[in-house]
């Protein structure tokens, strides 16, 4: 049992007013709102850092399960009540602490936004104190965590947003936000770019709505709607006991982004190739241009980022390819309910040799593998499919039919060339030839079941030391 999370984006229309977008004043309202909420968040970050002992306080409570008094860490809601009691001026507590008077610094701020800032500050300070405690236990001088920052995308709790997307055939769709104009807080309508995709995801049964976040960028603004869903899934040990278990193995590569094989009862019953559709070469040309421009511009200035538009284009290409490959993997898993998704346990893969642009391209390809793995895990878990990472040793070197060590080769102008990067695999024992990526994907199943040379290592038993 677990919880799956997904996010659906709803872009705000900030185009020209003549084109149906929001006017420039409404854009300024969003910037002012984010700015004042960052200042409020900074106020409470400083407040909790000054009273850090309160965050580690233990409170007593009566446990209905154990029928006795127990202790637990103070909750975020209790910290919120305590912070409001000492910083906000109300009839119940008209005299807040003089140096921490929030009502004086931020008059007329809606209490919903104030509580959103307090909750964010609690999470930031608790994470900082936890990291600092871990660093102090290591005894190292380097790596000291820095103080938490106050910038964050504001959470829009109930009472600060009203969404009205209308029917699918309507063109006028708006979202009403409570924003800060620089002088007061008021409700403002913003046109949005709604779609059938958003409406279907937003109203899909079984998903619980969370508070959306306002993500404001230089030239765009979006509302990110998070949704959660409780998932019932078997443990891997329980699934492995099933003799008819279906396993879905994925081998990640450069040209073939993912080679998916499905195995049941010891036989491969389905194979799917997900290619990059020219992504690797297209990305290499961009990175070659980037390397040349960086060389022409000379030594980079510290703190400045060059070629931001081109780098953003490369990142968006990788993200799009990762989501599409992960969706293909999740679609295969959806055909076999109760299956287990298998990936190789790949960690550090360093690009060596070649030119700077090729090393950069290999690094981007390696990062793309990690993105595909993470997105596929999330999408598959939303369907009740559990993911397992297996030992990757020898998956590309051993035969998936007999288990003998083979070799990789390629055909260049009709000649057979043996190379580590060969696209084909050949076994000298059983004379089996196949696509090298397919062979590696089939071996991932053998690694999961600990077949052939993928046996679990036996722990060395300590030998008794003779006495005397």
Indicate where each model-derived feature is located.
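Broad gene-expression machinery/nucleic-acid interaction feature
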Residues: 7-9, 158-160, 172-176, 220-222, ...
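Positively charged, helix-rich recognition surfaces that bind polyanionic ligands
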Residues: 4-6, 221-468
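Short glycine-/small-residue-rich flexible loop motifs, especially phosphate/cofactor-binding loops
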Residues: 31, 92, 125, 330, ...
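Generic detection of short hydrophobic beta-strand segments and adjacent strand-loop junctions
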Residues: 4-21, 184-196, 272-276, 403
């Amino acid at each position: 049992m677990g919880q799956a999370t997904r996010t659906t984006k709803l872009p705000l229309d900030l185009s020209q007013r003549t084109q149906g977008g929001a006017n420039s004043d409404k854009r300024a309202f969003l910037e002012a709102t984010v700015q004042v909420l960052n200042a409020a968040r900074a106020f409470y970050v400083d407040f909790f850092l000054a009273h850090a002992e309160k965050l580690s306080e233990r409170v007593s409570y009566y446990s209905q399960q154990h029928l006795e008094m127990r202790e637990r860490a103070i909750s975020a809601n209790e910290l919120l009540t305590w912070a409001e009691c000492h910083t906000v001026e109300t009839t119940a507590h008209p005299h807040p602490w003089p140096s921490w008077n929030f009502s004086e610094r931020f008059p007329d701020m809606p209490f919903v936004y104030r509580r959103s800032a307090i909750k964010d500050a609690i999470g930031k300070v608790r994470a900082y104190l936890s990291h600092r405690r871990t660093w102090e236990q290591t005894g190292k001088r380097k790596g000291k965590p820095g103080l938490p920052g106050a910038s964050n995308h504001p959470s829009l709790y109930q009472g600060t947003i009203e969404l009205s997307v209308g029917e699918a055939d309507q063109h006028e769709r708006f979202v009403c936000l409570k924003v800060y104009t620089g002088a007061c807080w008021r409700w403002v309508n913003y046109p949005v770019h709604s779609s059938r995709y958003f409406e279907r995801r937003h109203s899909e049964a079984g998903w619980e709505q969370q508070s959306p976040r306002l993500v404001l960028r230089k030239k765009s603004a979006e509302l990110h709607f998070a949704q959660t869903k409780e998932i019932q899934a078997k443990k891997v040990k329980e699934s492995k006991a099933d003799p008819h278990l279906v396993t879905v193995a994925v081998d990640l590569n450069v040209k073939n982004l993912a080679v998916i094989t499905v195995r049941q009862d010891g036989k491969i019953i389905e194979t799917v190739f997900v290619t990059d559709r020219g992504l690797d070469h297209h990305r290499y040309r961009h990175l070659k241009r980037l390397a040349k421009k960086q060389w022409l511009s000379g030594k980079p200035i510290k703190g400045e980022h060059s070629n931001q538009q081109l780098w953003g284009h490369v990142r968006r290409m990788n993200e799009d390819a990762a989501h599409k490959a992960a969706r293909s993997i999740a679609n295969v898993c959806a055909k076999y309910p109760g299956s287990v998704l298998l990936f190789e346990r790949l960690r550090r893969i360093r690009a060596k040799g070649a030119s700077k642009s090729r090393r950069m391209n290999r690094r981007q390809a390696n990062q793309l593998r990690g993105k595909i793995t993470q997105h596929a895990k999330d999408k598959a878990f939303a369907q009740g499919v559990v993911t397992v990472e297996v030992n990757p040793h020898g998956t590309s070197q051993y035969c998936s039919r007999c288990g003998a060590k083979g070799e990789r080769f390629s055909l260049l102008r009709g000649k057979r060339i043996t190379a580590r990067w060969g696209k084909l695999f050949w076994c000298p024992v059983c004379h089996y030839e196949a696509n090298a990526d397919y062979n590696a994907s089939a071996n991932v199943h053998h690694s999961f079941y600990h077949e052939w040379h993928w046996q679990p290592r036996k722990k060395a038993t300590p030998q008794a030391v003779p006495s005397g």
